[in-house]
Amino acid sequence: MIFFTITGSLTAAIVYDRRERRRVQQKWCDLVAHLSKETLPIEQTRRKLTIFLSAPPGDGLRIAREHFKEYVKPILVAAALDYTVIEGRREGDVRAALAERIRKHRRKAGEPSSVVEEMSNEDIIADARQKIGVVEEPGPKGDLVIGRHTWKEYIRGLHEGWLGPLDPPSPPDAPVKGPSVPVEGSETPADGTPAEENTEKKEEAEKKDDKPAKPSGPTPAYVSPAEYSSRSLPPTLPQSLDSSVPIPFPHLLGFLNTPIRLYRYLSRRHLADEIGREVAGLVLASSSRPYHDGSFSSDSELSGAMVDAGASTLSSPDDMMPSSSAKYEQQTVLEKEESEWHKSVHKRDEENPDKEREWIDDIVLDPRIASRMQRSLLSADEEARSQRITEGKEYILGEERPAPVSFWQRMWIKYGYGEDEETIRMKPIIGNLDGADGE
């Protein structure tokens, strides 16, 4: 009896959570589904978002991909939006990729640089589209950042790309070793090996040097956080950057944390609701606000009109110099996730303790960049409409809610030989091919 009680309770909790999670996700999908019905001119491509994700501390990239596919991708598919994914397998990959992307944009805008870029597949496709007159759909874009660790790399890469130089810094000088002095009166060098063997080893070393060496890590940063205040803003920096949305990515490891992990597994509907609201706000792009700094309270909300008004005042590169006492909202976003990271992540490299660590170092912001960042929000009207969708009073914009389907009919359609009305409607109607007399 005890066994059946525990098993039945656990099964009921799992089934209930999955059903509620599907219902919550369907609400946010219905909220943005009207965008997929909009038609575009033949010379325009769909609006594209940028997804930033990286392997969580202490785990692999597959976990981050599953988190994206489970909570974020269904809403993007419902809105029929295009997206680009920037992935990072190691610490610093997202930072390096974003910084290089911004530097590439600055070079294309006309800023002088001695770097000769190679044509990538994306450049070839973009050049072909430009020749035939295909342009992107006008409208606001956005960046969706998954997890606190990715968010810290995103902030670092944003500053490095806009404040750093376009040309890579010169590598540090390697220590010069003195030549070995051979012993007089002997035919072998000082190491005791014959001269022929040394010659063969040198030839093998030269062959190895000819092969391109694999990078041992991400590209080193072009500028350090301590140099932010001394760098001038590039002329191609816009008055306001694309909107960004940090997405929570709780990832707790360890056997002793099993009760917490079990509770989170049985209450994933709340996480789906929170992520769905943030993603829907970025997809609809109906409202945005600048991130708060030390002068704003956490409860204050600024409208999208104040974004342009605040950004227009930053016309000089020397405006708003860094203040050590300022506390920005970007520094506290998803801060609770850091306490759940594996303890091995917080260890410094004993051989190189001064090495930069994007995940464990404090977030350093330059006010000139931080004030240009915006955060997408779900407007009050869209929030009210999502509530009406939950209550069944409203459906996708421009459509009526279909008639409810019974449980048994739904099972017959899903697992049996039944067909829903939409599938039947899409079937071609073939007339009598044998003629009127049936021959």
Swiss-Prot record:
The chain crosses the membrane at residues 71-87. It is a single-pass membrane protein. The keyword Transcription does not apply. GO terms for biological process: protein transport. Residues 227-239 have a biased composition (Polar residues). The keyword Iron does not apply. InterPro entries: Lipid_Phosphate_FormReg, Mt_import_IM_translocase_Tim54. Keywords: Membrane, Mitochondrion, Mitochondrion inner membrane, Protein transport, Translocation, Transmembrane, Transmembrane helix, Transport. GO terms for cellular component: cytoplasm; intracellular membrane-bounded organelle; membrane; mitochondrial inner membrane. It is found in: Mitochondrion inner membrane. Residues 164-239, 309-328 are annotated as: Disordered. Residues 315-325 have a biased composition (Low complexity). Residues 198-213 have a biased composition (Basic and acidic residues). Belongs to the TIM54 family. Essential component of the TIM22 complex, a complex that mediates the import and insertion of multi-pass transmembrane proteins into the mitochondrial inner membrane. The TIM22 complex forms a twin-pore translocase that uses the membrane potential as external driving force. Component of the TIM22 complex, whose core is composed of TIM22 and TIM54, associated with the 70 kDa heterohexamer composed of TIM9 and TIM10 (or TIM8 and TIM13). This is Mitochondrial import inner membrane translocase subunit tim54. The lineage of its organism: Eukaryota, Fungi, Dikarya, Ascomycota, Pezizomycotina.
